[in-house]
Regions:
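N-terminal-proximal low-complexity accessory segments that begin disordered
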Residues: 3-56
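Buried hydrophobic positions in well-ordered alpha/beta secondary-structure cores of metabolic enzymes
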Residues: 31, 190-192, 268, 338
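Internal helix-loop-helix
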Residues: 55-153, 205
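Gly/Pro-rich turn-and-neighbor structural signature
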Residues: 124-189
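A short core secondary-structure module
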Residues: 193, 197-247
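Glycine-rich beta->alpha junctions and the first turn(s) of the following alpha-helix
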Residues: 249-344
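Long, well-ordered mid-to-C-terminal structural blocks that present hydrophobic/aromatic surfaces
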Residues: 309-312, 316-388
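Alpha-helix capping/hinge segments and adjacent helical runs
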Residues: 373-518, 523
């Protein structure tokens, strides 16, 4: 009797680590070749962060948020590989990313989610242009394999770019951009460089995508495909994740020794990609749409990621106030700083929520697209306010976070006792807890890791200039002009094509109404069990 095979099981964090041992990528870190990515201490904090996205999918408290049912297969998949088909799905994704980044600072796997959405939209667009179904079927087969194997995909989008004043085909060195060097009946061969690839060493596969809108002369550079991380001809030159095993000025890094992020420069040297893994190969006129789709999804997701980091700063700031002997609720100067920090974090996160609620179904695919205005406003706010977030954490904490004696003094019999007595601020908080809170904030905001969070917040997902461009491109300025001209009872110009009225946004605050959120709606969020018990 024939029986159906059971559906694939979602991996745990331990399964993910073990799966990495089945790959043999060519990875260099700090000038040495890595024998086993899964076992290398320099990469462990990054692997820990990704592993948490697997473990949370198995915890009853988090599983409703961290898993979803894939409509095209009916299977339960990890939220990070699921395609959103409603505004509720976008909200669930937002909360899931905030959850995992509260624990890890940056869980990285959400890039998989964003890239799969962009390629789904691209594939449907290509099929509609050709009148066929080949691209959609190809992508769906790949998607189901990724979901069934519970893979983590890296996004290889940012090219080395070379001379920024020249287009890809004009570069003196063509390998500053990834491009197609050969086509045959079995697939394509690509060469070139992707300069900034998040988590590259400990991904299962890389999704190669164009980083800009290509012209007809750049057709060979318009390429999107999936490449196993250990493909022949691929070399990854990476930096360590976090600060594993490194003694800093104020002791071991309390957070970044556990969680961090590696990035890698990916060098492609005649890497063969079979056609079933190719999603764009020379269709230059669609490259800009792919880049735009990914950027919109990713900028909304970044909002949630940095809100999770903001939660860490809010909690650490409140702890430091307490350790210093103050109740921020009773001290106006501290309360004002804490409320400003909360306002920043929840303010840009609210833009992510709005981007979900006002999201729209893609005109070609079944997936939902976040509203680009709110997605870009939220990302712009977090990019520029990350420095204020650090400043506020520093203000409520005091200078102790960078002036503490080193941890060796904690064990020096000639100084430890006296330091414990004189550096204790509150009778209710032991000295050891005060210095631990101080060193935690130092790690997050005032050391290497703090600078790293600032830069990835500013430039990750695109520069502030790119976000401002998208906000202006999509914001309905024309509707506002019409409003004022109607109140003035006359138009200032009879030209309907004048520049300031080109941008219009149907469906929001207009006759057609807002787009329906769709189903399923947002799942119930996990409750804080500690808070519930104390209440």
């Amino acid at each position: 009797m024939n029986t159906m095979a059971p559906p694939p099981a979602l991996m745990t964090g331990a399964d993910y680590r073990e799966s990495l041992r089945r790959y043999r990528p060519r990875v260099s870190v700090d000038g040495r070749w890595v024998d086993s990515v899964a076992d290398d201490p320099a990469l462990r904090p990054g692997i820990n962060a990704v592993a948490l996205t697997y473990d949370f999918a198995h915890q009853p408290k988090y599983a409703p948020l961290m898993t979803a049912t894939q409509p095209t297969s009916g299977r339960t998949v990890n939220r990070m590989t699921h395609l959103s088909t409603s505004a509720g799905d976008l909200l669930n994704k937002l909360e899931a990313v905030r959850l995992i980044c509260q624990e890890t600072g940056c869980a990285q796997r959400y890039l998989t989610h964003d890239a799969l959405h962009a390629i789904a939209q691209l594939s449907a667009r290509l099929d509609d242009a050709s009148g066929g179904r080949e691209r959609g079927d190809r992508f769906l087969a790949y998607l189901h394999r990724v979901q069934d194997q519970d893979l983590t995909l890296g996004v290889a989008m940012t090219d080395a770019k070379g001379d920024r004043s020249r287009r890809p085909h004009q570069q003196a060195n063509a390998d500053t951009y990834v491009h197609i060097v050969e086509r045959n009946a079995k697939g394509i061969v690509i060469s070139g460089t992707k300069a900034i690839v998040t988590g590259a060493p400990y991904m299962h596969e890389l999704l190669v995508m164009p980083c800009r809108n290509m012209g007809e002369a750049d057709a060979d550079f318009a390429v999107c495909c999936a490449v196993p991380v250990d493909a022949e001809g691929l070399t990854i030159v990476a930096r360590p994740a976090g600060r594993p095993g490194e003694r800093l000025e104020h002791g071991d890094a309390l957070f970044s020794r556990r969680f961090g992020q590696s990035t890698g420069v990916c060098l492609f040297d005649r890497v063969f990609v079979p056609w079933e893994r190719v999603f764009l190969a020379g269709e230059w006129e669609h490259s800009g749409h792919l880049t735009y789709s990914y950027a919109t999804h990713h900028r909304q997701t970044c909002i949630a990621a940095r809100a999770g980091f903001g939660d860490l700063l809010i909690g650490a700031g409140a702890l430091m106030c307490e350790a210093n002997g103050f109740d921020p609720g009773a001290e106006s100067h501290l309360r004002e700083q804490m409320v400003e920090l909360i306002t920043i974090v929840e303010g840009f996160y609210a833009c992510g929520v709005a981007a979900s609620v006002y999201g729209r179904r893609d005109e070609h695919a079944e997936v939902f697209m976040p509203d680009p205005v709110f997605a870009n406003i939220g990302k712009l706010l977090l990019a520029t306010k990350i420095y204020d977030m650090h400043r506020l954490a520093h203000t409520v904490s005091g200078g102790l976070i960078v002036t503490l004696p080193g941890p060796d003094e904690d064990h020096n019999p000639e100084t430890a006792g006296r330091l414990s007595d004189v550096l204790r601020a509150s009778p209710d908080v032991p000295y050891e807890q005060r210095i631990q809170a101080a060193r935690f904030i130092e790690d997050l905001t005032a050391g290497y890791q703090g600078g790293w969070y600032s830069v990835i917040s500013l430039h990750g997902g695109g520069s502030p200039a790119a976000m401002k461009q998208e906000i202006w491109r999509h914001y309905p300025v024309g509707d506002k002009v019409d409003l004022v001209e109607r109140l003035l009872e006359r138009g200032l110009s009879a030209d309907p094509a004048r520049a300031i009225t080109r941008n219009r946004q149907p469906g929001r605050c207009c006759d057609s109404g807002c787009t329906q959120p769709g189903q399923p709606m947002m799942v119930s969020l996990p409750t804080n069990t500690k808070a519930t018990k104390s209440a």
